[in-house]
Amino acid sequence: MTDIKTSLPRIAAIGIAVSALGLAGCDDTGADPKLQIGANPLLPPLHQYLLPPIRIATPVEWGSQTPKVTQGLQVHALAAGLQHPRSVYVLPNGDVLVVESNGPKAPVFRPKDLITGVVQLFAGAKAKDANRITLLRDTNGDGIPDQRTVFLDHLNSPFGIALVGHDLYVANTDAIMRYPYQDGQTSITAKGTKLTDLPGGPIDHHWTKSLLASPDGSKLYVGVGSNCNVGENGLQAEYERAAIWEVDRATGAHRVFASGVRNPTGLQWEPTTGKLWAIANERDEIGPDLVPDYLTSVQDGGFYGWPYSYYGQHLDPRVQPQRPDLVARAIVPDYALSSHVAPLGFAMSSGHGFPASYESGAFVGEHGSWDRTPLNGYKVVFVPFKDGKPSGPAQDVVTGFLDTNNHTHGRPVGLAVDRTGALLIADDVGNTVWRVSSATTAPKPAS
């Protein structure tokens, strides 16, 4: 990533230019986000904009600071000086894989595309793409890696990882690749084989491809985001996108497992019921409180509304012609996270290593908003579960990424739980992986 010290003046100048264009002149003041968290979120009337209002958090360095954690927890940097870390994955032997990645260059078809690029640059999201996976190894169990190696490189905007037996799968933006892996291996030099193509460029609006193996290892599940906000690039560009794929691991054949999910950036199995759950980024540009991003169970064959509707049968008038047949069966998501928080990280609690209040539930990394006031997200929350379903309000677990001056030291992305039960957080603006653990428990691998 370009060094923050040298890039901030250039980024600030761009931000001033954006403001001068009057792009932030619309009323974007939102309601209390707490009103949009849970099973029955506030869904106010929508507002349409010629150009979206822009509210951007200015990136600054962490320096000697760290994120803030709730009582009973502690946090330290597992690894710093990374290059735009987007996701983390823990191997069976405890090694941690860090995906350092960014999206491919996007084409500009309309003024809004240019604005999007400016927003991403100003927010620190347009870093140089390392296209690699770095391995971190802690040999003495003190929670601090003493080995750091390039595990796999020359990838194409990778995001998701899944290990099944001795096959390591990497979801590049345009394909799932398979690599041979042996326990304890610190690098892979073998050329990978393609399992299946994935929807990629030239637009590739949502480039991240989340990845999860089925419990029996026979299938892979892939989150494939839409190619636009809400159909403006033509629905022909959305073929098999805004969907969760099921891929046969033996043949590479795939089917759409669920559709109408605008951007499913994280997939997990709920441990007590065995059901598939996902986090999703919903649409923009119809107001500061629309549409809430969400956490939901995923039904085989289910349709979740995008682009025609949201939260069941709430129509989006920007999409014409409508599909009343699809809208009629659109599923209401289980749990709203509030609007524009941009959930990009998802991990189910392991049931050990954290205080008892975190024994059952989901951790969600909220990357943060760019189009509402006040800013929303920029934290990691915990949604408690009971009997396999959300059972209460989301709780702040890790904050401090955003300060009171709307400066962002970092932005949480991918999450993982290590063998000790500690929570790992990829921070793609601070270029750090943070490790959050119990303040009273020394690192000890789970049996």
Feature-to-residue mapping (PLM):
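Hydrophobic core register within WD40 beta-propeller blades
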Residues: 88, 161, 211, 264-267, ...
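C-terminal motif of bacterial Sec signal peptides marking the signal peptidase cleavage site
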Residues: 22-25
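Surface loop/turn motifs at the tips and blade-to-blade linkers of beta-strand repeat domains
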Residues: 78-81, 150-155, 195-203, 256-260, ...
